[in-house]
């Protein structure tokens, strides 16, 4: 019995030694490279994330220099990779967006496309939390407005980071709107 126990212990030690040897032979060696870093106050451009400024544009039939409006609003913003354009369509709450209105929207997107920012775009009818005053009486106008601006969004999609909201509700955020029921979305 004693010989069997001794033989078993030697066998276990031998198997353990072989396993350790195989492990050491095949184990991947981690190669470390030493790097030296120095502190820097240099600004790092970090696209598509972080804080952003919000810029508002009221669209109407009056010809507008959207590039000048955008430049004027953005003159102090030099350090953000994102920006939000709130495009107010309240002038069209009871009608389709006119040819002139669509031209102003197109001019705005042209101006936005030459900035370094990527744009969060929100179409809305209300800036003051009073959507019942400015929202279209019929969801059909909202849908038509979405269709009308769709081509512009597609054309300038390289500068659009995301489209935010669904046009309706206080501040275009879908809250407090009569169109938030399930029937409207069907």
Report the location of each language-model feature:
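An active-site-proximal structural segment forming one wall of the substrate-binding cleft
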Residues: 101-118, 135-162, 184-185
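The substrate-binding groove and active-site-proximal loops of carbohydrate-active enzymes
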Residues: 89-100, 129-140, 169-180
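Active-site groove signature of glycoside hydrolases
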Residues: 120-130, 149-180
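Hydrophobic alpha-helical membrane-insertion segments, chiefly the h-region
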Residues: 13-24
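Hydrophobic faces of well-ordered beta-strands that scaffold small-molecule active sites
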Residues: 51-55, 83-85, 119-122, 161, ...
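Aromatic-lined substrate-binding rim segments of carbohydrate-active enzymes
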Residues: 68-126, 140-141
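N-terminal Sec-pathway targeting helices
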Residues: 1-15
């Amino acid at each position: 019995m004693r010989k069997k126990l001794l033989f078993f212990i030697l066998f276990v030690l031998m198997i353990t030694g072989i396993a350790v040897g195989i492990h050491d032979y095949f184990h991947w060696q981690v190669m470390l490279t030493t790097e030296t870093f120095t502190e820097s106050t240099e600004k790092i451009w970090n696209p598509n994330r972080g804080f952003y400024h919000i810029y508002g544009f009221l669209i109407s039939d009056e010809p507008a220099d959207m590039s000048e409006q955008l430049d004027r609003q953005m003159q102090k913003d030099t350090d953000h990779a994102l920006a939000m354009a709130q495009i107010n369509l309240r002038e069209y709450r009871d009608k389709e967006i006119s040819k002139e209105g669509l031209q102003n929207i197109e001019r705005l997107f042209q101006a936005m496309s030459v900035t370094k920012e990527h744009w969060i775009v929100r179409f809305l009818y209300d800036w003051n939390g009073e959507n019942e005053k400015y929202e279209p009486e019929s969801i059909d106008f909202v849908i038509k407005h979405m269709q009308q601006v769709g081509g512009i969004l597609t054309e300038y999609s390289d500068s659009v980071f995301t489209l935010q909201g669904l046009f309706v509700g206080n501040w275009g955020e879908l809250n407090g709107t009569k169109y938030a029921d399930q029937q409207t979305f069907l």
